[in-house]
């Protein structure tokens, strides 16, 4: 992002392009919001295996703590 701040002329030209296609950007934002939810679900499933392994070790530790208590 620092490159955008350093090159102000480029950022202005890019903002002008974004201002011209605001309707398209809004439509894309709505689609991205839906796709992001699907992608988040997909990422959740993809990482769920890793999280399941980590949480499994954490659950075992919690169970060990309850057993020790």
Swiss-Prot record:
Its main location: nucleus. Residues 7-25, 34-63 have a biased composition (Basic residues). Coiled coil: none annotated. It is found in: Nucleus; Chromosome. Residues 1-69 are annotated as: Disordered. Keywords: Chromosome, Developmental protein, Differentiation, DNA condensation, DNA-binding, Nucleosome core, Nucleus, Spermatogenesis. The keyword Membrane does not apply. GO terms for cellular component: nucleosome; nucleus. Testis. Belongs to the protamine P1 family. This is Sperm protamine P1. The lineage of its organism: Eukaryota, Metazoa, Chordata, Craniata, Vertebrata. The gene is PRM1.
